[in-house]
Amino acid sequence: MNETNYNDIDQLIYLFSKLPGLGIRSARRIALYLLQDKDVRLKSLINNLVEIDKKIVKCEICGNMDTENICRICSSEYRDKSIIAIVETVAELWAMERSGNFKGLYHVLGHNLSAASRQNPSILRLPELLTRCFAENIKEVIIATNSTLEGQTTAYFITEYLKEHPAKISRLASGIPIGGELDYLDEGTVSAAINLRQPFE
């Protein structure tokens, strides 16, 4: 194996190792798996990534990722359009969808507020949220930020921001441990948290 190829493979392993949940050993196994049958496995992955890169866009309404400018959730006639869940990222949106227990709409903040990083609240897409609440006649806002310090800080800030809107504001409840992130919880736990949500003041 010449030096150029060796460096290319090392770079592939390094890139895999930077994916969430993967260390260098897992990355090496994945790279080897793909390279051992590269005409099928590697090319299939490459083709899929190219297609995703071409098609995936951010939903203009909620911030979800989909192949349409207005995602399947926002455009669905079967969703309860009187309830909106506020999540930090698309990962939490997908976690709630996997639970199969939430049939409302979403609003992806894209960030949370961290005292340590002194982030500006303007990054949270709250003006868009307030506009949606009035325009879509939202009856309940579920704050589904994570149970981390940053998530709690963000939740309180959102509550203050939405005071001028009459919607009921609730918070995910039982089953979310302190410091817990929705994306790492099983579907049953997320379902319980949705069902047992409590008023948030």
Curated annotation (Swiss-Prot):
<dbReference type="GO" id="GO:0006281">
    <property type="term" value="P:DNA repair"/>
</dbReference>
<keyword id="KW-0233">DNA recombination</keyword>
<feature type="domain" description="Toprim">
    <location>
        <begin position="82"/>
        <end position="177"/>
    </location>
</feature>
<dbReference type="InterPro" id="IPR000093">
    <property type="entry name" value="DNA_Rcmb_RecR"/>
</dbReference>
<dbReference type="Pfam" id="PF13662">
    <property type="entry name" value="Toprim_4"/>
</dbReference>
<dbReference type="InterPro" id="IPR015967">
    <property type="entry name" value="Rcmb_RecR_Znf"/>
</dbReference>
<dbReference type="GO" id="GO:0003677">
    <property type="term" value="F:DNA binding"/>
</dbReference>
<keyword id="KW-0234">DNA repair</keyword>
<keyword id="KW-0227">DNA damage</keyword>
<dbReference type="InterPro" id="IPR023627">
    <property type="entry name" value="Rcmb_RecR"/>
</dbReference>
<dbReference type="GO" id="GO:0008270">
    <property type="term" value="F:zinc ion binding"/>
</dbReference>
<dbReference type="Pfam" id="PF21176">
    <property type="entry name" value="RecR_HhH"/>
</dbReference>
<dbReference type="InterPro" id="IPR006171">
    <property type="entry name" value="TOPRIM_dom"/>
</dbReference>
<dbReference type="Pfam" id="PF02132">
    <property type="entry name" value="RecR_ZnF"/>
</dbReference>
<dbReference type="Pfam" id="PF21175">
    <property type="entry name" value="RecR_C"/>
</dbReference>
<protein>
    <recommendedName>
        <fullName>Recombination protein RecR</fullName>
    </recommendedName>
</protein>
<keyword id="KW-0863">Zinc-finger</keyword>
<keyword id="KW-0479">Metal-binding</keyword>
<keyword id="KW-0862">Zinc</keyword>
<comment type="function">
    <text>May play a role in DNA repair. It seems to be involved in an RecBC-independent recombinational process of DNA repair. It may act with RecF and RecO.</text>
</comment>
<comment type="similarity">
    <text>Belongs to the RecR family.</text>
</comment>
<dbReference type="InterPro" id="IPR034137">
    <property type="entry name" value="TOPRIM_RecR"/>
</dbReference>
<feature type="zinc finger region" description="C4-type">
    <location>
        <begin position="59"/>
        <end position="74"/>
    </location>
</feature>
<dbReference type="GO" id="GO:0006310">
    <property type="term" value="P:DNA recombination"/>
</dbReference>
